[in-house]
Every structure is written in structure tokens, then in C-alpha cells.
């Protein structure tokens, strides 16, 4: 699977699992994405896909590296569809 395709799938999953934040942007907690069965089956490397999406300014989140458990409450915010 290529990176562009995985980033597009990530955007779809944020739409499915996310909700509007105070700024009116779609967001989802990292833990929700990481623990979702469909996401687990779609993404071989969720953190890598998130990093690629962040580099492309499609999503934003605090920090550079997200770890399961430690960063479950970090918001992944969708910047563009």
C-alpha cells in the first residue's frame, strides 16, 4: 500500500470515529484510533501513517511520537479533507 492511499484511509477513519472540537474541526483521540478493530486491520503502522499525514499538514497533534497507553488522550485533529 502506498503512503497517499494510507493517509486517505486515515482521513476516512477520522471522519468515522471523530467529532467536532471547539474550533469546529474534526478530531479523535489517539487511543480511539489505535484500539479500533477496523483501524488495526487497515494500518500496518498507524503511527507511521499519522507522521506522514502530519508532514503533509493533513492532521496535527501534540508531540512527534505517539505511544499506545502513554498518549491515548492526545487529540488527532484533521486540518484538511
From Swiss-Prot:
SMART domains: Costars (SM01283). InterPro entries: Costars, Costars_dom, Costars_sf. Keywords: Acetylation. Belongs to the costars family. It comes from the Eukaryota. Pfam families: Costars (PF14705). The modification N-acetylmethionine is found at residue 1. This is Costars family protein ABRACL. The keyword Acetylation applies.
Amino acid at each position: 500500500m502506498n503512503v497517499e492511499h494510507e493517509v486517505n484511509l486515515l482521513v476516512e477513519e477520522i471522519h468515522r470515529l471523530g467529532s467536532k472540537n471547539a474550533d469546529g474541526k474534526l478530531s479523535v483521540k489517539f487511543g480511539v484510533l489505535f484500539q479500533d478493530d477496523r483501524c488495526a486491520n487497515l494500518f500496518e503502522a498507524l503511527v507511521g501513517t499519522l507522521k506522514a499525514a502530519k508532514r503533509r499538514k493533513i492532521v496535527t497533534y501534540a508531540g512527534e511520537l505517539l505511544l499506545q497507553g502513554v498518549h491515548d488522550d492526545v487529540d488527532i485533529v484533521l486540518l484538511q479533507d
